[in-house]
A protein has these predicted regions:
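Long, highly charged, low-complexity intrinsically disordered interaction regions
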Residues: 4, 56, 62-80, 90, ...
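Structured, non-catalytic alpha/beta "coupling" segments that mediate domain-domain communication
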Residues: 74, 98-102, 229-242, 252-277, ...
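A glycine-rich phosphate-binding loop feature that marks nucleotide/adenosyl-phosphate handling sites
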Residues: 182-189, 322-326, 380-385, 405-412, ...
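Short flexible coil/turn linkers enriched for glycine and charged/polar residues
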Residues: 15-16, 28-29, 95-96, 109, ...
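Short, ordered loop/turn segments at secondary-structure junctions
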Residues: 38-40, 129, 242, 324, ...
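Single-stranded RNA-binding regions, centering on S1/OB-family and related RNA-binding modules
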Residues: 546-731
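Generic start-of-chain signal for non-secretory N-termini
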Residues: 1-20, 27
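Duplex nucleic acid-engaging cores and interfaces of nucleic-acid transaction enzymes
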Residues: 34, 50-53, 60-321, 325-426, ...
Length: 731
């Protein structure tokens, strides 16, 4: 375990004692959000992303150790485990290294080498591989192994069988495979061509009909696109490796300078490479590239999901949600500032001029009746026509504004059992309009009801391993929910189940308890909820807010275990609990007293004390409120209105490997290629922007026919500055 901790510490750039503390906390059953927030002193204040990376690597290394022991036992059972081999197994740090070492001892199907061994030719192969300087001519040596009774008719047959054994031995050699793996990763080229019969067919894979790229320069999105094109029968894919360079690698590992049987062994090495090594290592390299691409796609999805969930809520407004459509009309829902449905309707603005006028009048009446100030417009089918109608309406209704809201996943949610349980009285289509309205009011509370994969901010999410994607995205959702905290008396089961220590069952039990007994008036009261024990309470308590509690600390993110410390801290600075919420001088008084001295007096560490001070100064703080508010609109442009050089403000909708998609209000997102994101080289656009960022862009090119907009952020003035400098700001 100590070796594992040192390795993790080196990989993550953390101190071994901090990594060891995290391992212990995880093994004790603590959740990542709890460790990140309330055990900072023990792990050096790692953030939740680092902690999740650590947990994943820890699991990988433990699985590696388990596989190492399985291999050791298997080889030992064959009585072939030498001290040298055991040391090599212990030194292996990747699964491929372990499997390479195990390969010669792994049970195999019946091969040409197996048959040759059955015919008694293993000693001949061993002599030839021994390469003694005084070794007789191979054919002369093979004459002694000819045995018609065993199927070896001639010396040539014996030599051929020995060659099969040597080829398999070379193929199974860990050093050979390691050298070739390194060569192929550095020098191989991926080539794709149109599959037979597809050469003239138009498809999304045309870019890859004649494509060559060195392996080190392959991008994740290219690998996943090629894999999909091959799977769908559009592409033929090959890996090209310099055969002579590969054979040099093999011979260096096998041949002894000046040794006997050199010509025979050279031929056997060629056979080993062509027949056994190259096909298997090409498959291995393709698999490794796919794994890397999958990890990148999952990482990209998680990077995009976090800022989407953490978009600032638009609180305190009656909001109208519009789910556009053609044949089924535009679905309308009006919700109050708490998200409660006030009214619904269906209008048909695309049917005729008369229906459009009727739709505008219906929306105007609803806005007047309920004093609607904000409109959330879904970005799906018929959104362009609906947006034009909304703009015409807003020219009559001054003071109101609208925002385009991604409706990704809304239809999935509206048809789900959860939506049916929440809105049994409403049609499926109307539920999606409610969801769209609520997404503007509180994106996090609404988006947690939807499978993260359906939110649509990734690339190739349907091609990556579902289990890995689910785990990564669930972690992001959990981190976001706990970073914000939840109101114990208003949170839905969907939100509560994401709180550290809770699950779907305890979340439903909390809601059932408050429906039966009324609002919670203290955090500890949650311990009365069935199936919610002390351990779950410890993990969850700090993330649950109870504004109705007479204990003011229940309104904050201060953990109950630190209540005494918080009161002591207030006393040291001349305050009482009753002063919480009006502590503008607390930081200055603490500085005058001495932070280290105060932390010692309170029996806590400095990181915990800083968190407590932040909560006391702003009880019930929501980190999302500190981020830029979403951009609201009152008018719209058309694609034909765009001209090269125009400078616009837009909202980042998606960040992928090759660029950034930006909504600039023309029904078609524009693309900022990675080379146009900022004034210096970046490896990934996420280094500069995140989903939800409001950015300034300039139009480079407009292709109306293909509905493509090329944008740039380079040298575009923003807020009086000279242009983006690639320094990503906190959102």
């Amino acid at each position: 375990m100590e070796d594992m901790i040192r390795l993790l510490a080196a990989e993550l750039g953390q101190k071994p004692q901090h990594v060891g503390a995290v391992v212990r906390l995880l093994d004790e059953g603590n959740t990542i959000p709890f460790i990140a927030r309330y055990r900072k002193e023990q792990h050096g204040a790692m953030d939740d992303t680092t902690l999740r990376t650590l947990a994943e690597r820890l699991q990988y290394l433990r699985n590696l150790d388990q596989r190492r022991e399985e291999i050791r036992r298997s080889i030992a059972a064959q009585e072939k485990l030498t001290d040298e081999l055991d040391a090599a197994l212990q030194a292996a740090v990747t699964l491929s290294e372990l499997e390479d070492l195990y390969r010669p001892y792994k049970p195999k199907r019946r091969t040409r080498a197996t048959i040759a061994r059955e015919r008694g030719l293993a000693p001949l192969a061993e002599q030839l591989l021994g390469q003694a300087r005084d070794l007789p001519d191979p054919l002369t040596l093979a004459a002694g192994f000819a045995d018609p009774a065993r199927g070896v008719e001639t010396p040539e047959d014996a030599l051929a069988g020995a060659s099969d054994i040597v080829a398999e031995t070379v193929s199974d050699d860990a050093a050979v495979r390691k050298a070739l793996r390194s060569l192929m990763q550095r020098q191989s080229v991926l080539r794709t061509q149109a599959a037979k019969g597809k050469e003239e067919e138009t498809s999304v894979y045309q870019l890859y009909y004649d494509f060559r790229q060195p392996v080190p320069r392959l991008q994740g999105h290219q690998i996943l696109a090629v894999n999909r094109g091959e799977r769908e029968g559009f592409l033929k894919v090959t890996l090209e490796t310099d055969r002579e360079q590969a054979l040099i690698c093999v011979r260096r590992c096998v041949l002894v300078p000046g040794g006997g049987a050199a010509a025979f062994l050279r031929a056997a090495c060629e056979d080993a490479y062509d027949r056994l090594i190259a096909p298997s290592m090409e498959r291995e390299l393709r698999a490794a590239l796919t794994e890397q691409a999958n990890e990148g796609a999952i990482r990209n999805f998680a990077l995009n999901l976090r800022p989407l969930l953490m978009q600032p809520p638009v609180r305190g407004h009656v909001t109208m949600g519009l789910d556009p459509g053609y044949s089924h009309g535009c679905k309308v829902a009006v919700v109050d500032p708490t998200g409660k449905v006030l009214d619904t309707a269906v209008v048909y603005p695309t049917f005729s001029k008369a229906k459009r006028a009727e739709a505008i009048e219906t929306l105007r009446r609803l806005m007047d009746r309920y004093e609607v100030t904000h409109i959330a417009l879904g970005n799906g089918t018929a959104s362009r026509e609906t947006e034009a109608m909304v703009c015409e309406l807003l020219r009559q209704k001054h003071g109101a504004a609208y925002m385009i809201v991604s409706e990704a996943g809304a239809s999935v949610y509206s048809a789900s059992p959860l939506a049916a349980e929440e809105f049994p009285q409403y049609d499926v289509n109307l539920r999606s309009a409610v969801s769209i309205a609520r997404r503007l009011q509180d994106p996090l509370a609404e988006l947690v009801k939807i499978d993260p994969k359906a939110i649509g901010v990734g690339q190739y999410q349907h091609d990556v391993p579902e289990k890995q994607l689910d785990e990564a995205l669930s972690g992001v959702v959990e981190d976001c929910v706990n970073a914000v905290g939840v109101d114990l008396n208003t949170a839905s089961p969907s939100l509560l189940r994401r709180v550290a220590g809770l699950n779907a069952t305890t979340a439903k039990n909390i809601v059932a308890y408050r429906e039966e007994h009324g609002a919670f008036t203290a955090r500890r009261q949650v311990l009365k909820v069935p199936k919610l024990g002390q351990r779950a309470y410890e993990q969850a308590a700090g993330f649950l807010r109870v504004p109705e509690s007479p204990q003011v600390l229940d309104h904050t993110g201060v953990h109950p275990e630190s209540y005494a410390a918080a009161e002591t801290l207030l006393g040291l600075c001349g305050y009482r609990l009753a002063d919480v919420g009006a502590l503008t001088e607390l930081p200055a008084r603490l500085e005058a007293y001495g932070p280290a001295r105060a932390a010692e007096a309170c029996g806590i560490g400095l990181p915990t004390m800083r968190d407590i001070v932040r909560e006391l100064c702003k009880p019930g703080r929501d980190p999302r409120d500190e981020l830029p508010q979403p951009a609201l609109r009152t008018d719209v442009q058309e694609l034909k209105d765009l001209k090269p050089g125009m400078v616009l403000t837009g909202t980042v909708r998606n960040v992928i490997d090759f660029g950034v998609f930006v909504d600039i209000g023309v029904h078609q997102d524009g693309l900022v290629h990675i080379s146009q994101v900022c004034n210096k080289f970046i490896k990934h656009p996420s280094e500069a922007v995140s989903v939800g960022d409001v950015v300034r862009v300039a139009v480079l090119e407009v292709d109306e026919k293909r509905k493509r907009i090329s944008l740039t952020m380079r040298g575009v003035p923003k807020d009086g500055e000279t242009g983006p400098d690639c320094q990503k700001t906190a959102r």
